[in-house]
A protein has these predicted regions:
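Acidic/glycine-rich phosphate/pyrophosphate-binding loops and surrounding catalytic core
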Residues: 1-56, 60-67, 71, 83-88, ...
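Short secondary-structure boundary segments
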Residues: 76, 99, 120-121
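Active-site loop ensemble at the mouth of alpha/beta enzyme cores that anchors a bound cofactor
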Residues: 132-140
Length: 140
């Protein structure tokens, strides 16, 4: 990634709490108020760690902002919805665009003003280089 000019804003599961929609559902925190309650619970359990919360619609954004999560992951949103999320957020949280993120789509999404773009295509759709090695013994 770094060789290609990309950088990571997360290194592992230890450096930030990531609350996905399925986590909320499994914890019984789905539905209205679930984002607020899940962020509150995470902060009590792991004080000092930043929190990222996933949303999949603009309707969830006000609650995510109210939770004061440092990062909000915009999952599988249209480019227009991402641009609206940037406007609504107004720098109150960092926004990460994710889901259905092809390499061709990245410039369009970057133009929305999101802070981060994650793309699984960098790992699951990479084209490997055709590299070979010949071993030559000295003196032959």
């Amino acid at each position: 990634m770094a060789v290609g000019g990309a950088s990571n804003h997360r290194i592992g599961l230890y450096d930030r709490i990531m609350i996905k929609d399925n986590h909320r559902e499994l914890a019984g925190l789905g539905g209205t108020g679930g984002i607020l309650r899940s962020v509150e619970r995470a902060r009590k359990m792991y004080p000092g760690l930043e929190v990222e919360v996933e949303i999949d619609s603009l309707a969830e954004l006000p609650e995510a902002l109210e939770s004061k999560a440092e990062y909000i992951l915009l999952d599988n949103m249209s480019t227009a919805d991402m641009a609206e999320a940037v406007r609504m957020t107004n720098h109150r949280a960092k926004l990460e665009a994710s889901g259905n993120m092809t390499l061709a789509r990245i410039p369009e999404v970057a133009a929305t003003g999101v802070d981060y773009i994650s793309s699984g295509a960098l790992t699951h759709s990479v084209k490997s280089a055709d590299i070979s090695m010949d071993i030559i013994q000295p003196g032959k």
